[in-house]
């Protein structure tokens, strides 16, 4: 698959007005999303990855083939993404609540965030194509679902070490085949960092630290093309994104991104 994208920085003061404009353009209300994103890097050379028996036993055969191709092709960072809810933030494991003397244990257990029930998908995104002369950013991408629960041993079996994690917070709109995402990156507070492991639970949302200290957001408009070998389809996709750019030019300036700023290769 190929992803074609345009990007625009959005100051915090413009966030609300742009949400309203995007709602009008797409004729839909914003779909609020929260994603927990774990970053992994390979510790083995390309072509050497051999999953341990049982490491991917819950993944069906087509997914195993896709994973093999995705994770065995080169030294690239990959992200493991889990969708979470607003109510997942600030909930502790029940064992912690019990230790702290919580009196409403039943309700705590029902509503708490449990990483063992977290579903995941692996996202691979290549460095954007070079020398295309295109007005949009284009790059090869691939995604695959993986088992629930503790993802670190699964990724270890594929030859990947955990590096870091963050939360993507934003609003999504759909316009025909274009996904429009107005979002920002939130880092975990220092006290929630574990050596070599993701956090066991999500801190309160208000304790998360914006990557952009000014509170700014990033607007990304993307179209994913399944048949990247079809030049007419690729051209039509570019034209649709440029049409959206023209439509929104009074509010934001959508542009292609600097290629090296999206470099996912392991240095």
UniProtKB/Swiss-Prot annotation:
Record text on subunit structure and interactions: Component of the Mediator complex.
Function summary: Component of the Mediator complex, a coactivator involved in the regulated transcription of nearly all RNA polymerase II-dependent genes. Mediator functions as a bridge to convey information from gene-specific regulatory proteins to the basal RNA polymerase II transcription machinery. Mediator is recruited to promoters by direct interactions with regulatory proteins and serves as a scaffold for the assembly of a functional preinitiation complex with RNA polymerase II and the general transcription factors.
Biological processes annotated in GO: regulation of transcription by RNA polymerase II; termination of RNA polymerase II transcription
Chief location category: nucleus
A UniProt-annotated Pfam family: Med18
UniProt KW keywords: Activator, Nucleus, Transcription, Transcription regulation
Paired cysteines (S-S): none
GO molecular function: transcription coregulator activity
Subcellular location: Nucleus
Keyword Chaperone: no
Family statement: Belongs to the Mediator complex subunit 18 family.
Cellular component, GO annotation: core mediator complex; mediator complex
Protein name: Mediator of RNA polymerase II transcription subunit 18
